[in-house]
Amino acid sequence: MAFADLDSAAQLVEAGYRIALEEGLGAVSARTAAARAGAAASAVNYYFGDRAGFLRRIQALALDEAEGAREAAAAGLARGPRWNSLADRMTLLVAERLQAGRLGFVLLGEFEIEAEVGGDLELQAAAGRGGEAEFAFWRETALVLGAAEGDADGWAGLAVGLLTLLHVEPDAGERLLWLAPAFRRLGARLGGTAIEPVPAGPAPDEVLPEREHANDTARRIVEAAIAGIADRGVSRLTQRDVAARAGVSLAATTYFFRTKADLVEAAMVELHRQVRAEVLASADDAGVATVMAPTGGFSARVRALGALQLAAAREPALQPLAAAVRATRGATSMRMLRRQGVNDADGLDAMVWSTLMGGLIGKLRFAAPADREAAFGAMRDRLQARLFGKV
């Protein structure tokens, strides 16, 4: 339907949705949406009550678009020659979803953070339904393409995890170089075929830039930026807000971090270090599971790191750092797998496992707290046994 054929409320929703896709959820306001729709800003409050009501309608449209994309993908499952493997076909389908709707996934990720930070129960419920629907689609797709019933959660978890890992990457070729090996390795592990180990990769400390903060003031500023990003996202973060949170002057903030981009980069590196250290500090398997499971919602640090990664989708200056963080994927999981007695895993196995677990967490992120830890643990244990054997 053409924009001009929509009623006034629908035009505002469409305008808000387009702004959110192009510039991020933080750019959506009554003023910006009304300006694009050619309406008065007061029309947003008239139709939707407040910004929260407006965002719910935009989220509903984003979820409808995702459902339409899934339906279109389902119509193309029979393509290709008969010798294509399940891994080949899953690679193609995920690549196509990212090519056609990468920013749509970014926007849904922003809505998840908005739902957690704002505590809007309607946003949370809708985000939960969206996550469940995406996982269910990939599970059913894997079954249609020939996966065994007991393996379908693994294929679905990896698909969802890779969509989340790669939706910030604008280069289709770069995305494909992550997708194809991951699905092939999952297929080999599930099929019990020979594994050709990959070369050892660099440690995270070798990939990410060194950030030795000058003094306690600089460290406080970075921690304040992390807190601000967790609360407000990257787009609404200002150096003035960070200075106030840190209890320092704006001049002190700009002395250590000349631009907002410098501050955001420092926050991303520090967040990655903190989250990784928290996982590795877990003394036993139960501790590791507690850190990785979505019990009680994501921590502020994990949420802030997610917000930074999402910001990189639209901010070219952040993309090299986002790629550097992605290059460390699996480094922590390798240590965790070793602790649990998996001694034959290589770096690709660890990346696949970490990404698959991320997909399971995405499915359960907004599930009832009483249910999600048990569900996550059961799926994790069953899949670990399928991929790596009983340990």
How should these model regions be labeled?
Residues 1-8, 209-217:
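Short, Lys/Arg-enriched anionic-surface-contact patches
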Residues 11, 21-57, 220, 224, ...:
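Helix-turn-helix
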Residues 54, 58-62, 66-69, 77:
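N-terminal membrane-targeting/anchoring modules of bacterial envelope and secretion proteins
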Residues 60-66, 269-275, 281:
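Short, basic, alpha-helical segments at the C-terminal edge of helix-turn-helix-like DNA-binding modules
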Residues 66, 106-116, 156, 285, ...:
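Short, structured motif recognition centered on aromatic/hydrophobic residues
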Residues 71-105, 277-303:
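Hydrophobic alpha-helical connector segments
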Residues 102-109, 119-144, 299-306, 316-341, ...:
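Amphipathic alpha-helical packing segments from all-alpha helical-bundle domains
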Residues 124-128, 143-199, 319, 323, ...:
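Hydrophobic/aromatic-rich alpha-helical bundle segments in the mid-to-C-terminal region
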